[in-house]
């Protein structure tokens, strides 16, 4: 196999990064966005001695477990979701099989014992819009427009998207308010290569039991100009409880700074796990 070869591959497995795995004449290929059961046409982009990587060019025969349309139109470009093309039930079966296989192969747990003690994987009633926390990088596109979204896989290139299918629906409204505020008031986005610009990230938290909302802007400075204009828009959103800034002037990939400054409301939101009440600040660990 050589780079740029065009091959037809039947996908038999999925790798740890969500890439489809298939073989051509015994040669293993890893193909992003292909799922188990697909027969695809792929172009080899990197060829090593015993395996290679290929780009999905065409789906010859789709898997019976392939969805017609992923929930997020950015799924293939964004680095956040790897197997959104697969039906949710098939995702669960794949994950359960991966855990079982690792326990047998790596942990050397006898199959007979697993058959007795391993319970079926428990899925969610709603596998979208379930995350109570999201962190969105802020940047600019080639035309200089301020954008937000998530990074493309293994890059720091932002795929513009304010409507992530994993976060709560109100995130989109919050992000669009912030983007408009920045554009209208000439607030710069942070450039991590030049270490210039002000707004680095936006952190949003939501309490599913309390409906409380938190917005925290991470900035490369001590102050957010015209903050009162942003607060005036955000505080009108139902459930808004906390609006803060996080000061992070370090040249680092660490998102949050240690200093939190209050703009409006309080510095935390509350939520419950069972009967236990939690106070959650911008810096708190709280399972997403």
Positions of PLM-derived features:
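Accessory RNA-recognition modules of RNA-modification enzymes
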Residues: 1-288
């Amino acid at each position: 196999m050589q780079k740029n070869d065009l091959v037809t591959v039947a996908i038999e497995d999925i790798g740890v990064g969500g890439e489809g795995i298939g073989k051509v004449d015994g040669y293993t290929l890893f193909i992003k966005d292909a799922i188990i059961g697909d027969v695809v046409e792929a172009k080899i982009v990197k060829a090593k001695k015993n395996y290679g990587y290929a780009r999905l060019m065409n789906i010859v025969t789709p898997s019976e477990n392939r969805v017609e349309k992923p929930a997020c139109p950015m799924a293939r470009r964004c680095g956040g979701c790897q197997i959104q093309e697969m039906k949710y039930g098939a995702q669960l079966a794949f994950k359960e099989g991966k855990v079982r296989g690792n326990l047998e192969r790596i942990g050397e747990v006898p199959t007979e014992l697993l058959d007795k003690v391993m319970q079926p994987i428990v899925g969610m009633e709603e596998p979208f819009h379930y995350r109570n926390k999201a962190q969105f990088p802020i940047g600019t596109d080639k035309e200089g427009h301020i954008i937000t979204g998530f990074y493309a896989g293994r890059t720091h290139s932002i795929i513009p998207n304010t409507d992530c299918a994993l976060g709560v629906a109100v995130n989109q409204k919050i992000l669009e308010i912030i983007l408009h505020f920045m554009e209208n008031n000439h607030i710069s986005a942070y450039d991590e290569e030049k270490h210039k610009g002000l707004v680095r990230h936006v952190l949003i938290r939501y309490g599913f039991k309390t409906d409380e909302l938190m917005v925290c802007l991470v900035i490369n400075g001590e102050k957010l100009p015209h903050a009162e204009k942003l607060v005036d828009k955000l505080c009108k959103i139902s459930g808004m409880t906390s609006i803060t800034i996080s000061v992070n002037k370090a040249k680092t990939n660490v998102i949050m700074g240690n200093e939190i400054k209050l703009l409006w409301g309080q510095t935390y939101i509350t939520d419950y796990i069972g009967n236990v009440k939690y106070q959650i600040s911008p810096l708190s660990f709280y399972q997403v």
